[in-house]
Design a protein with these regions (language model features):
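Acidic catalytic loop of the alpha/beta-hydrolase fold
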Residues: 234-239
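Serine-hydrolase catalytic-loop signature spanning alpha/beta hydrolases and amidase-signature enzymes
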Residues: 28-38, 49
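Catalytic active-site module of serine/aspartate enzymes centered on a nucleophile-bearing elbow/loop
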Residues: 253-305
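Active-site loop/oxyanion-hole signature of alpha/beta-hydrolase fold enzymes
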Residues: 2-15, 45, 50-99, 111, ...
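Helix-loop "lid/cap" segments that line or gate small-molecule binding pockets
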Residues: 158-183, 192-195, 207-212
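Flexible "cap/lid" loop of the alpha/beta hydrolase fold
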Residues: 109, 116-157
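Short beta-strand/loop motif that positions the catalytic acidic residue
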Residues: 224, 230-232
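Active-site glycine-rich loops that stabilize anionic/oxyanionic intermediates
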Residues: 20, 28-31, 98
């Protein structure tokens, strides 16, 4: 695990590969760069691959929320862009899972020149967002803000977090989310739990579960100018595939929407044998197309440039 300093905070990341297009992998809520452990080395055979821990997660720092950094998609999107500039030192493909997709989309909208393309795996639909709750009948929409307010009380929120941060609870949640239960291992449970024991982890968790504002994927997708590949585990109980398909149906930048039968919310961990070749082949194809567009008269000119 390597470290990078960002705005005075420690950011952990992993790296594999020394040649080829740059690819930055972004984990989901409560996870870390280790959630890409089945992808990093394989993709590193053809790419320069980086998997980073977002601020507040994994082995990255967990500063007190809003002092001064807030745990929002704008913050994380800027973290990824600065990582591309300072560590990758150039444009990169961004691959995300769950809320990592929103982070990738935010980065691509904020600075289109920094992002070569997006690979979105079971994008978070943010179904508990304030704007989405407004469309519900009042008796269905009122429950979430009440619970969020209660969790803001330390005497309630902290025991709630501690009750979740237990091996049996994490194992049960993963088995609900994963279509392939054999991918739920003791190793997976342990590396997801380990950061929860660090100072600040409770505050990060409670800040995010109370965060029902900010961008929705349907806000960001129409603003993206780079090509997009979407992979979706068909058995995801949290982000239903029909809603995912509808989300991207009218987005011209989405080149492919690929259902993954029998796979749940985390395809990169459940089915790396499916995900890795698709990510590799598509990003290499996009990189070659971009190179040809820059140097339309052949390799000789490209080599002299």
């Amino acid at each position: 695990m390597q470290q990078w300093q960002w705005r005075g905070q420690r950011i952990a990341y992993q790296q594999a590969g020394t040649t080829g297009p740059a690819l930055v992998l972004i984990h989901g809520f409560g996870a870390s760069s280790l959630h890409w452990r089945k992808n990093l080395e394989v993709l590193g055979e053809t790419h320069r691959v980086y998997a980073l821990d977002l601020l507040g997660f994994g082995r990255s720092a967990k500063p007190t929320p809003n002092q001064p950094l807030s745990y929002t998609f704008e913050t994380w999107g800027q973290q990824v862009l600065d990582f591309c500039r300072e560590v990758v030192q150039g444009p990169a493909f961004l691959g995300g899972n769950s809320i990592g997709c929103i982070v990738a989309l935010q980065a691509a909208v904020t600075d289109p020149k920094a992002v070569s393309g997006l690979v979105l795996l079971n994008c978070s639909l943010r179904l508990l967002h304030d704007r989405k709750r407004q469309a519900l009948p009042w008796y269905r929409s009122i429950g979430t803000p009440v619970i969020q307010s209660l969790l803001g009380v330390k005497a309630i929120g902290q025991p709630f977090f501690q009750s979740l941060a237990q091996p049996k609870t994490v194992d049960r949640v993963l088995r609900q989310a994963y279509g392939r239960e054999d991918a739920v291992t003791e190793e997976l449970v342990n590396f997801l739990l380990e950061p929860s024991r660090e100072p600040g982890a409770v505050d990060v968790f409670l800040a995010f579960v109370r965060y029902s504002q900010g961008p929705l994927p349907e806000d960001l997708l129409p603003q993206v100018s780079c090509p997009i590949l979407v992979l979706w585990g068909a058995e995801d109980p949290w982000e239903p595939i029909d809603l995912g398909r509808a989300l991207v149906a009218d987005i011209p930048q989405v080149e492919h929407f690929v259902p993954l039968p029998g796979v749940g919310h985390c395809p990169q961990d459940e089915a790396p044998e499916l995900v890795n070749p698709m990510v590799r082949d598509w990003t290499l194809q996009k990189a070659r197309q971009k190179a040809r567009s820059r140097f339309p008269f052949g390799r000789g000119l490209a080599a002299r440039a």
